[in-house]
């Protein structure tokens, strides 16, 4: 079972209205009422983009208990104000226009290419822009790095009993607002990978 956590903001509501992504999740959980849900019912919990920091901090202990119980926690977008332990986030200037510049590029490189996610996601699907980067913990697998060696996407199976998946990418935001075409194949890739993992 996969649960996805939302603020209930307009872009999130538009995302949840998209029929093509309903197979990504089984239940929608509102973060303001997270205490009403039994998180033990879920194998994977997705924290969608741009959730309220005060509520994330309020429920930090529940998220930690969830992942320490051997489950998978996925965090999309910025991880601000040190709300989650082990995550080293640094803001960066956002390059919104590299694709319209002559010879423009947004340098990044796949890592650990044998990870099963790469059966469903290509580099082009992850390349639009980013708001910051992570320093992946020792022993974690970075899947996408920028030239300075920091990560845009990593999988951590060493810091907790479960699996922490963290990416700077914010596909639900862009799908909900109707721009950044790459966000769709990227999120479909995530969904296919999760459903494959669920079936094992």
Over which residues does each language-model region extend?
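Short amphipathic alpha-helical segments and helix-helix/interface helices
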Residues: 16-18, 60-67, 132, 187, ...
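A glycine-rich, often tryptophan-bearing local segment used as a flexible ligand/cofactor-contacting loop or short
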Residues: 54-125
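Aromatic-Pro/Gly-enriched surface loop or interdomain linker
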Residues: 1-44, 189-200
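Catalytic beta-strand/loop cores that center a nucleophilic Ser/Cys/Thr
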Residues: 13-19, 104-179, 183, 198
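Short, flexible loop segments at the rims of nucleotide/cofactor-binding pockets, characterized by
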Residues: 22-27, 49-53, 142-145
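Structural motif
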Residues: 4-10, 31-32, 47-51, 76-79, ...
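Alpha-helical scaffolding within the catalytic cores
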Residues: 29-34, 58, 149-152
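Short, well-ordered alpha-helix to beta-strand connector turns
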Residues: 41-44, 70, 140
């Amino acid at each position: 079972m996969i649960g996805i956590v939302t603020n209930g903001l307009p872009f999130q509501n538009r995302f949840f209205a998209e029929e093509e992504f309903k197979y990504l999740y089984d239940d929608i959980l509102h973060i303001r009422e997270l205490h009403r849900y039994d998180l033990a019912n879920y194998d994977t919990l997705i924290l969608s983009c741009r959730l309220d920091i005060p509520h994330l901090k309020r429920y930090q202990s529940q998220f930690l208990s969830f992942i320490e119980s051997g489950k998978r926690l996925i965090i999309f977008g910025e991880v601000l104000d040190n709300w989650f332990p082990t995550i080293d986030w640094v803001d960066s200037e956002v390059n919104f226009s590299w694709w319209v510049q002559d010879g423009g590029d947004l340098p990044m490189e796949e890592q650990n290419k044998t990870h099963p996610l790469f059966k469903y996601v290509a580099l082009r699907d992850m390349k639009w822009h980013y708001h910051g980067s992570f320093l992946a913990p020792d022993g974690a697998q970075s899947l996408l790095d920028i030239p300075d060696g920091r990560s845009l996407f990593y999988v951590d199976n060493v810091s907790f009993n479960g699996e922490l998946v963290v990416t700077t990418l914010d596909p639900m935001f862009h799908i909900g607002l109707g721009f950044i075409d790459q966000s769709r194949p990227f999120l479909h890739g995530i969904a296919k990978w999760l459903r494959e993992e669920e079936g094992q």
